[in-house]
Amino acid sequence: MRNTSKEVQSTSYRYAPCDWYYHLPVKRSEKPVGAPPASQIPGLSDLRDSPNVNLPRARRYWIKETDSEYVKLAKQGGRPDLLKHFAPGTRQGSPVAYSLPDWYIHHSKPPTSHQREVPVVSIPDYMVYEEFNPDQANGSYESRQGPFDFDRKTIWQREAEELENVKRKVKLPAINSKNPSKTGTPVSHKEPERSRLSLPPMPGQKNSSPTNFSKLISNGYKDEWLQQQKAEADRRTPKTSRASVSSKSTEDSKSNQDTETPENPETPEGSEKTPDAEVSSPSESTPAELK
């Protein structure tokens, strides 16, 4: 930038200075100016060289017992050559470029097979396959279980095994299902004690035919059950009671007919009512609102 001090003085009446864009260099003063220290931490700046300060008296109370190790080190001047890097064996010789580690530079030579270390690979026990060797077992071999163990026993089988271990045997009633298509037995209200002991058959011991889903959707099993219930009801009712009920019903019907038609010899034969008239008579007796 050229010096325009003369132009500014001659043309100050025409152009206003742009102070926000540039500033004129101020003339340096030749008076000595006290520069601030490079660091505000005592002991790291040029205070040790200042002749106006009494060093023993000023530094007497610098380091205190309550100061941390970092503050004590900073007050004593810090670690020497903290920000300098010295390559090994080159401190007394000519300066050498910064030595980078081998893992950082791709130009470095890869280690040979003799220098390589075999990495130690650790695999979980359940992922390692080992062939069974009976010679190494010696009676103390335990089969390894997988990470997930499934219990396939039902609660009834487990309870039965526990009772056998305690030598307490409970005799359960036999499960005789009348309907082979159903897995459970119907609970009857007449025998509550027996129904408590009845248990459904085991899923593995099912000998009946598999469920026919087309028959299940079309309510075929329901119709079979209704037919079986009806047949059982017919078997329970005795045949003698049916005959007595039928004879009583016939006698009652005959007595009702005799009471309704009394004997009258004087009535002519033509006065007998025809069946058509008997059929039409109830329609005449019905009120007009119901017609």
Swiss-Prot record:
Record's compositionally biased regions (Polar residues): 176-186, 205-217, 280-291
Region span, Disordered: 29-50, 168-291
The protein, known as: Uncharacterized protein C7orf57 homolog
Modified residues (Phosphoserine): 50
InterPro entries: DUF5524
Disulfide bonds: none
Organism of provenance: Mus musculus
Keywords: Phosphoprotein
Biased composition (Basic and acidic residues): 221-237
PANTHER family: CHROMOSOME 7 OPEN READING FRAME 57, SI:DKEY-276J7.1
